[in-house]
């Protein structure tokens, strides 16, 4: 048997079928093969990782053109600042986030009960 047959299968989860990214459930190294699972644990794809992707980070599961929307959990989370290939790490180096933090509200002062 070769060495790769002894290695634990690497995993990532995709939240919806419309998503262009999956979330790494393991630390992924360039060259790793990763099984993409749905929330129901069904294997919906497999791809070769082209960049190191830390646990909890996003990796592309389909080609994303420069200027195209990046979708996670069925929501647009940003726009690609460069072309992104399947298996690439998706983070601030290749997307422009559309996240807008909610306005800060002043917390009410605590009152002591008499």
What residues fall within each predicted segment?
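N-terminal small-residue-enriched
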Residues: 2-114
